[in-house]
Structure formats: C-alpha cells, structure tokens
Amino acid sequence: MSMMSEFKTFAMRGNVIDLAVGVIIGAAFGKIVDSVVNDLIMPVIGRIVGKLDFSNMFVTLAEPPPGTPMTLDALKKAGVPVFAYGNFLTIVVNFVILAFIIFLMVRAFNKMRAEEPAPAEPPPPPEDIVLLREIRDSLKTRQP
C-alpha cells in the first residue's frame, strides 16, 4: 500500500473527521468565550476594581525611551520589556470560564449517558426447563 493511500485511509476514518470538526467548533467557541470575557465580564470586574481596562495593566521592567507613550502596545513596539499582568488576568478568566462551560457540557453528557437503561438480564428459565435439564444431565452420566 502506498503512503498516499495509507494517508487517505487514515484521514477518512470517522475519528479523525470527528476530531477535525471538534477543533473547528472549539476554535469558534473560543472566540465566543473571548468576547464574553473581554466585552461583558472584564468591564464589570474592572468597574468594581476601579480600572476599566485590564489590558493596559502592566509594569515596565526597563526605562522606556524618551517620548514613548506609556501604553502597552507602544512600549512593546519600542522593545521595552513589560510585565503585562492585566492581559494575563484576562486570559486566566477566559480559561476558567471555558473550563467551567466544558465541565457543564461533560456533566450533562454523562447524565444523559447514565440515564440510558442498562440492558435487562434475561429472566431465569422456568422451573420445568431447569428440571428437564437436570434429568438430561443425569441421563448422560448413566449411559455407558
């Protein structure tokens, strides 16, 4: 089998296609979570804490060149090392929300799977069948 046909067989398996669909949907869902965090949650947290924009919370680790604006983007473009803890906080909140949503989805899936009834055991054979089997086994042991 050639390498190309092996790859085609591998790529067309159901699991690989399911994984690809999952990755694409996950990427789109990640954008939704980013928007929820950046546009809805972080402004509320920023309002409570007193800073409206977490993305501009940083500490410079070196002296910036004279005349450089004190914004995160300008300092990064100027090559000034910065400790951007506000951006990190936003990413951590993103992760926690995404992990919680995935937890809820897995929990719901497990509940649905647990609710499926297990296949019932077959009922025991009637007593007359049991007696007939015992008689049959007894006759087998008596024959020479």
UniProtKB/Swiss-Prot annotation:
Transmembrane segments: 16-36, 86-106
Source taxon at top rank: Bacteria
GO molecular function, one term: mechanosensitive monoatomic ion channel activity
Protein's cellular compartments: Cell inner membrane
Entries under PROSITE patterns matching the protein: MSCL (PS01327)
Predominant location: membrane
GO CC field: plasma membrane
Membrane topology recorded in Swiss-Prot or TrEMBL: Multi-pass membrane protein
Pfam families: MscL (PF01741)
Keywords linked to the UniProt accession: Cell inner membrane, Cell membrane, Ion channel, Ion transport, Membrane, Transmembrane, Transmembrane helix, Transport
Family as reported in the entry's similarity comment: Belongs to the MscL family.
Its job: Channel that opens in response to stretch forces in the membrane lipid bilayer. May participate in the regulation of osmotic pressure changes within the cell.
NCBIfam families in alphabetical order: mscL (TIGR00220), PRK00567.1-4 (NF001843), PRK13952.1 (NF010557)
PANTHER family: LARGE-CONDUCTANCE MECHANOSENSITIVE CHANNEL (PTHR30266:SF2), MECHANOSENSITIVE CHANNEL MSCL (PTHR30266)
Quaternary assembly: Homopentamer.
Protein name: Large-conductance mechanosensitive channel
Protein species of origin: Cupriavidus pinatubonensis (strain JMP 134 / LMG 1197) (Cupriavidus necator (strain JMP 134))
